[in-house]
């Protein structure tokens, strides 16, 4: 068993004979107070290396990232899965959060990611070294991880090239729909190629006291770029973005989490107990569709003029 969660007497009484959450770990229960602590600690801060306290989200899923970058730990009876890593400066913070939550880096068996930009995978080589875990990624992301260099076709290439990464050995190349199976937990990878060529969203089931939720880690939906890049010069990229957002909108959805917490109001939803929302993924993707349409309209000169203030 890889850690135990504390169960309050009140929760045990209210749930009668229900079994405790299976095999999930650590010393922090997901009470309103602990969920609110993360939002309070990060209020006014969203730096990629701003330290944040670990937080138990639901069932076997934990937040062990920083104020600005999500890192998730999924705990199983056969070891743990880490989703995303962060910038190199955040590596000791992620390791410390795991320890504070009652986990060990040595128990991480797999490392996967959302997309292949340095703010989310810049420290994967070191996390792999520390844990001995295997790394899995979609083919476009695997190429970037193995080389440590960004994809030249990435809209953000001119920004990313200034931030080279330590190369990472990729142990398994995934296709959309493939799964990572560990200790009875199944993570499903889906290519949602809006933000990058290797953008990956993940879904899995997490249960507490016989109440199971779909956990949905939807990748970044933004279509930002380096100065001078025009999506309208790259019709294949436009098609990939539209298809990616379409897939994202249709993801099985229960508890939405995103690589940048602020992109989905993640901390605020945790603090107010409003995490479960089957419509959240569709709304998240819909807003991105509108923003991308605005971007294309601006590029083609067909954007509606802004009202005079």
Each language-model region and where it sits:
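C-terminal regulatory/interaction regions
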Residues: 21-25, 278-309
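Active-site HxH/HxHxD metal-binding segment of metal-dependent hydrolases
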Residues: 24, 61, 89-92, 99-179, ...
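Bacterial N-terminal signal peptides that target proteins for export
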Residues: 1-7
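Conserved beta-strand hairpin/beta-sheet module of binuclear metal-dependent hydrolase folds
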Residues: 47-101, 105, 201-223
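Divalent metal-coordination and catalytic microenvironments
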Residues: 60, 74, 84, 94, ...
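Metallo-beta-lactamase
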Residues: 41-43, 51, 56-59, 80, 87-89, 107, 169, 179-182, ...
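Bacterial Sec-dependent signal peptides at the C-terminal "C-region" and cleavage site
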Residues: 9, 13-22
């Amino acid at each position: 068993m890889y850690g135990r969660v504390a169960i309050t007497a009140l929760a045990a009484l209210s749930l009668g004979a229900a079994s405790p959450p299976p095999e999930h770990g650590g010393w922090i229960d997901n009470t309103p107070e602990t969920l609110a602590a993360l939002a309070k600690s990060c209020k006014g801060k969203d730096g990629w290396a701003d330290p944040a306290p670990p937080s138990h989200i639901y069932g076997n899923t934990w937040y062990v990232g920083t104020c600005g970058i999500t890192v998730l730990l999924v705990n199983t009876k056969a070891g743990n899965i880490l989703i995303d890593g962060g910038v190199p400066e955040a590596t000791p913070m992620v390791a410390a959060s795991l320890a504070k939550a009652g986990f060990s880096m040595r128990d991480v068996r797999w490392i996967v990611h959302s997309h292949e930009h340095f703010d989310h995978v810049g420290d994967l080589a070191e996390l792999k070294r520390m844990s001995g875990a295997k790394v899995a990624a979609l083919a476009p992301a695997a190429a970037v991880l193995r080389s440590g260099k960004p994809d030249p076709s990435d809209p953000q290439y001119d920004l990313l090239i200034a931030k080279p990464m330590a190369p990472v050995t990729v142990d398994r190349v995934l296709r959309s729909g493939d799964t990572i199976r560990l200790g009875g937990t199944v993570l499903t990878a889906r290519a949602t190629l809006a933000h990058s060529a290797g953008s990956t969203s993940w879904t899995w089931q997490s249960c507490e006291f016989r109440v199971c939720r779909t956990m949905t880690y939807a990748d970044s939906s933004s279509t930002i770029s380096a100065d001078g890049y025009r999506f309208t010069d790259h019709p294949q990229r436009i098609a990939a973005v539209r298809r990616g957002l379409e897939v994202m909108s249709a993801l099985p959805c229960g508890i939405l989490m995103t690589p940048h917490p602020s992109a989905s109001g993640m901390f605020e939803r945790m603090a107010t107990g409003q995490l479960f929302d089957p419509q959240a993924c569709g709304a998240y993707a819909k807003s991105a569709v509108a923003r991308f349409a605005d971007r294309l309209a601006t590029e083609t000169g067909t954007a509606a003029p802004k009202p005079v203030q």
